[in-house]
Amino acid sequence: MSFQAPRRLLELAGQSLLRDQALAISVLDELPRELFPRLFVEAFTSRCCEVLKVMVQAWPFPCLPLGSLMKTPDLEILHYVVDGIDCLLAQKVRPRRWKLQVLEMRDVDENFWTIWSGARPLSCSPEAMSKRQTVEDCPRTGEKQPLKVFMDVCLKEKSVDEDLSFFSGWVQHRRRSVHLCCTKVVNYSMNILNFRNILETVYPDSIQVLEIWNMCWPCMVAEVSRYLSQMKNLRKLFISDGCGYLPSFESQGQLVAEFSSVFLRLEYLQMLYMRRIRFFEGYLDQLIRCLKSPLETLALTYGSLDEEDLKCLPWYPSLSQLKQLNLSHGTLRFIRLEPLRALLEKVAATLQTLFLVDCGIGDSKLRVILPALSRCSNLTTFCFHGNDTSMDGLKDLLRHTGRLSNLSLETYPAPRESLDNRGRVISELLTPLQAELMRILREVREPNRIFFGPVSCPCCGMSPTEQLEFNFCLRGRPA
């Protein structure tokens, strides 16, 4: 018998059962586990909601990856699913067969369904796949563990998405038996009141990534600080102030103290991104000294680092193992760069990505950091475009970066000699200068992906942003 034959038999058996929903419901307790995923898909596709409700109560696997089936919110089906869960939660003794620990609403486990539909060989069971997701998050103890609903939160508008609103309301009255878990929470523009309501619903220990793009007002800083202190497993924090808010001198110290103290509780923080956050100018050391564990990523962009801020960076153990450093679009023109050199020396063995884009670094400033830069032997990405550098300065820079054999992406400004009086590139001047710079570099190594001048992808026009996890299309090379 071919591999597809038993799959076809399972499919036919499921379809036959669903023709009589009452029969399907009555036999679920005796239904072989192998039939559950296929029958669930058939019931979902056919919108046999009563069957879905009962199947949830008898689900024989630790995880129900509903999100990979439900590509768009379907409130009717969600109502039946949670009704089934409610029936179970209301029972003092859980059914023998019930193993459900996680309702997965993210689109992360499509393999669970495709394996049992016959789309690919059965290399591992759904139970094994489900356990990979749930063992770490849902350790079994002697007492009943709360059911966990996993979903990501992305808040772009004034109103909340239908599925998030639905689960928030459902979990609100079941806090002891159901946890709404969101590994990633992103707020682009939602007002503070609605954002607060969401944070109060989400189980704080589940949040590993928090991005806030509208950190514009003191009240938002205060609210975020209060909830941030509860996110004990936070790995990545991104905060951005689109308004460029600058507090009064009297309130600045209070904001800094309140926000910095939160970091004492974030033991697992690895990535810190601060974009246009100006209320830390001159007070950065207060935040850095509160970091409990070594960071892998530090991004301080579109801000105005002053000299005191830069001075503190080399001296704290929490910055001694950086893999990514981004100081782009900051004002370094009038600041001594000896502290930056000291920091680069300190992280030379670990640093992989360095962004110094549009920092106002001229030839004299560049010479200060070159010896330390040439020691960063594991550097794979170096972005330096947007700075005011002469041809001689770039030659010197390439002689130092030429020693970095692991570089796979490097961007440099057009030499000052190729610009007109408005700072625009004159291509007729840039071309021969670029050829000379490439010759100098090739004397040491063959570059992989390298750009000179205003950086944009020749294929799609994209350019690296101030964020380190940019998607940069590099299917072609400049001529």
UniProtKB/Swiss-Prot annotation:
One of its GO terms (molecular function) is ubiquitin-like ligase-substrate adaptor activity. LRR repeats lie at residues 15-38, 97-124, 179-203, 204-230, 231-265, 266-291, 292-323, 324-342, 348-375, 376-400. SUPFAM superfamilies: RNI-like (SSF52047). The keyword Secreted does not apply. Disulfide bonds: none annotated. GO terms for cellular component: Cul2-RING ubiquitin ligase complex; cytoplasm. PANTHER family: PRAME FAMILY MEMBER 19, SIMILAR TO PREFERENTIALLY EXPRESSED ANTIGEN IN MELANOMA-LIKE 3. This is PRAME family member 19. It comes from Homo sapiens (Human). The lineage of its organism: Eukaryota, Metazoa, Chordata, Craniata, Vertebrata. The gene is PRAMEF19.
